[in-house]
């Protein structure tokens, strides 16, 4: 099993836990992500510097290098994005578009967790939070 497959399986297993978690628990997880990004800021910047060095050595276009680059401001933006998601109303469990069929059957749509989404990108570390 490849590393990507193992990460996908771990994400799928985690999604089962999150799918039944309440809003407070999900928001606590998002806050933990934001706090970890802040706490590990210097480590993230050091790793990004390694990525930038490799990108330059590989001849990556300057426009892609700019998208790859992180600084304190960009990390703060990512952290802010995570906290904005936590501040949104939780739509899970919401029932919409209720209707009654001629035979009396009541039908509605219930919002449920989407599941796991994989995102592959070459040069935008913030895209995961933006998505």
Locations of the language-model features?
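N-terminal Rossmann-like NAD(P)+-binding subdomain of aldehyde/semialdehyde dehydrogenases
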Residues: 1-107
């Amino acid at each position: 099993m490849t590393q990507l497959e193992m990460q996908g399986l771990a994400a799928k297993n985690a999604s089962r836990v999150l799918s039944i978690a309440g809003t407070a628990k999900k928001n606590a997880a998002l806050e933990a992500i934001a706090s970890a990004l802040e706490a590990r800021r210097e480590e993230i910047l050091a790793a990004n510097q390694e990525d930038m060095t490799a990108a330059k050595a590989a001849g990556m276009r300057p426009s892609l290098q700019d998208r790859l680059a992180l600084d304190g401001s960009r990390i703060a933006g990512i952290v802010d994005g995570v906290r904005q998601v936590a501040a949104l109303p939780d739509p899970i469990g919401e029932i919409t578009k209720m209707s009654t069929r001629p035979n009396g059957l009541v039908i509605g749509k219930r919002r449920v967790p989407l599941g796991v989404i994989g995102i592959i990108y070459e040069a935008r570390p913030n895209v995961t939070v933006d998505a």
